[in-house]
Amino acid sequence: MVDPQLCCTPLSAAPLDRARAKQLAGLLKAVADPTRLQLLSRVAAAGDGEACVCDLTAPLGLTQPTVSHHLKVLVDAGLLTRQRRGPWAYYSLVRERFEDIRSLLSL
């Protein structure tokens, strides 16, 4: 048997349990799409911290139903919040969720 101290780097953080791994996998699945990454980027870059779906369709060259579908995936993953105002929905980042991604990437 090989001595782990001679060949292996010790873990600097506790390994993920199954529940946390599933949670983070869902989060990564939500952002593992170029359109959704663009949407997150546009919402993050919005001057007042939120973006209307009506302002996100033309820059991406996508229809409103397609953009709304991708935004729903991001809302369901907890990365965005949605607020209805009349016929439009406005989206804002949930910055705390990005800490989850950041902590995962620093493993």
What are these regions (language model features)?
Residues 100-101:
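Residues that scaffold the ATP/ADP-binding catalytic core of kinase and kinase-like folds
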Residues 36, 69-70:
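Histidine-centered divalent metal-coordination motifs
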Residues 22, 26-63, 85, 89-97:
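N-terminal helix-turn-helix DNA-binding core of bacterial DNA-binding proteins
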